[in-house]
Amino acid sequence: MTAEPNKPCQIKRDYPQLINLYPATADTDAHYLSKLSIYQQRVFEAHSQQKLLVLGQIGLSNGLELLSWWRAHSHLSQRLLLKVFEPNPINAYELKLLWDQSACLTKEPELEPLAQRLLHAEPAAIIGCQRLIFDDGRFTIDLHFGDIQSQLSSLIHSPMHPVQHWLILPHLLQALHHQSHWQMAKLSDDSATIATIGLSESSGLSETTVNRFQACGFTVSDINELGIHQPVTLINHQPDAVLLHERQVLRQQDAKAYAFNPMAAILSSATQSSIAIIGGGLASAHLALSLAERGQGAQVFCKDAELGQGASGNRQGAIYPLLTPENDELSRFFQQAFLFSRRRVQALTSAPADNQTPISHVFCGVLQTAHDERSQLRLDKIIQGQPWPSEIAYAVDAEQANAIAKINLDKPGFFYPLGGWVCPFEYADAAIQKAMQLADVSVSLNTDILAIERQSDGWVLLTEKERLGPFAQLVLANGAELTQFDASNKLQISPFRGQVSHVPAQFQLSQLATVLCANGYLTPSHQGLHCLGASYVKEPKHLDFCPQEQQENLAKMHESYPKQSWLEDIDMSGNNARVGVRMVTRDHFPMMGCAPDVPKIIKDYAQHQLTKESRHYWQTTPAPVHQGLYILGGLGSRGLSSGPLAAECLAAQLCGEPIPLDKATLCKLNPNRMWLRKLLKGKAL
């Protein structure tokens, strides 16, 4: 785990408190893990022909069940997605304390290496879903922290890859409400079953509990009663048709309530479909990687001679979450996304040296400070607005800030200990190289797509000299050129020029040990240079070097840290800088999902305007889209944090798999949201 200077204790609860919240089932039955292993073997045998197996687990306990699934799956070629629902969020530090104090891993030495990999992934005590990907996508964990009913009901049903089986840890059997049973049923395959371990009547496996699950169409089995020679067929069952209909009604209610947020129908076999991606930066590279982990190939078309020549071309970029005082959907999304991106960097750089593309990065933390009275009020609101997990961020006084930065700032701030800086173009290149190792992914450089056309058999891409395709699915992930095509030119997104200054590392300045974020940002040195930026010019007329913006970048640092002697070490005389364009949305969410058919939306609006009936129409009618066309962009100035998770979610959508975001956040990411937000409120376009 990352070491943070002067960090407060990340362990908020002592061992007795933790063991009470996360009781270990194995402590009450010495043969529990052996019985669990038999059950897991039966499950894998019953679904050996599936390329992806989705399983649900209620309760994290001390994590041994999760590690046991990982161990049991390690020799299999199929992919496993394990969705774990735990009401009490826990971080890596407290999880390690549980393991150390209980010595549970000493009894299961095979689990120790897996446990260390889980800790290295730094699960955080945040509400919502955290996706952890291991073994090149073969084993994926979705950690859903928070109220179980809320987490279950926030998810959409995945008809192609529903939950096949549920394991419920005994200490949470009684905590599940009848509504939770039905939400589990909504997310499940028709033949899905429930397993638990009936240690005693007090564990909750009573006749009443069993009857409640059966009333939702489940059969319930006790792992204690599952013999090693039990036939595989007993794992599956077919529930009553009436109960299946009730499940379908729940799914239809969801679909109707979120019809304005279309999730286009996926081809029945995603691995047989052809996918084209236009763009050569972080978004397209990570989409290719997420698809490749699913065995899905793609063709990437980049107009430049190398990848990462657009907004992804900077030498260094800060990686840290965007937080709000309310911890709203934007804030929660960025926490999930930031942690996901951080894990991506770790995974790509921990591969064997001969199988790895280097990514320059240092997780040195990010220190946010105010630069005037208004920004101080805003920062104070964020700090005081929530009991932020200290692995996400914590307040520091001026003395602590100086110690973290290794240069004098003399002002308090908010420190993001898991943050740092990453080289964006190396990050994009490493993702593409990994994708090409895993699946049939190709990259066509110097290929400028001038137009796209929809045909009956897919999308055709036009260059100056040739027609490419058709492709069943086309993703526009082309950064500043996102709106260049007729089908995307109405997207409500704006280009902003950003000039990043490169200044030599010298004297006191070279001692900077963390990323500073105030009015602008300043990175620690990399290859003898610091990055100082960035300007923010809407709809720029040119991308040439601008001396005025260079001086403005310097002035921002003087405003942020006035009268500090190290400011004199910032030498701008070399006029060394890089200019890029980032695409920004008004609400700061990226755009991810089906490309909206804006002319059709406007045409329908003419027929359904400003009445109660029209609001109902837009709420319950699938919003118009360009079939087979998708958008991935609008990453703004925080693409390093948001881009990889947005790409992962789009890859899941393209392949018909469970998406690691809740319904409300998916609506916030939808490229049609600016229009539909008004229409759902009965406002004029």
UniProtKB/Swiss-Prot annotation:
NCBIfam families: MnmC_Cterm (TIGR03197)
Gene Ontology molecular functions: flavin adenine dinucleotide binding; oxidoreductase activity, acting on the CH-NH group of donors; tRNA (5-methylaminomethyl-2-thiouridylate)(34)-methyltransferase activity
The organism of origin for this protein: Shewanella baltica (strain OS185)
Name of the encoding gene: mnmC
Primary residence: cytoplasm
Subcellular compartments: Cytoplasm
Gene3D superfamilies per the UniProt record, alphabetical: D-Amino Acid Oxidase, subunit A, domain 2, FAD/NAD(P)-binding domain, Vaccinia Virus protein VP39
Gene Ontology CC terms: cytoplasm
Lineage start: Bacteria, Pseudomonadati, Pseudomonadota, Gammaproteobacteria, Alteromonadales
The protein's name in its UniProt record: tRNA 5-methylaminomethyl-2-thiouridine biosynthesis bifunctional protein MnmC
Domain of life: Bacteria
Swiss-Prot/TrEMBL catalytic activity: 5-aminomethyl-2-thiouridine(34) in tRNA + S-adenosyl-L-methionine = 5-methylaminomethyl-2-thiouridine(34) in tRNA + S-adenosyl-L-homocysteine + H(+)
Renumbered residue ranges of the record's region FAD-dependent cmnm(5)s(2)U34 oxidoreductase: 278-685
Signal sequence, renumbered to the chain: none
Family, as annotated: In the N-terminal section; belongs to the methyltransferase superfamily. tRNA (mnm(5)s(2)U34)-methyltransferase family.
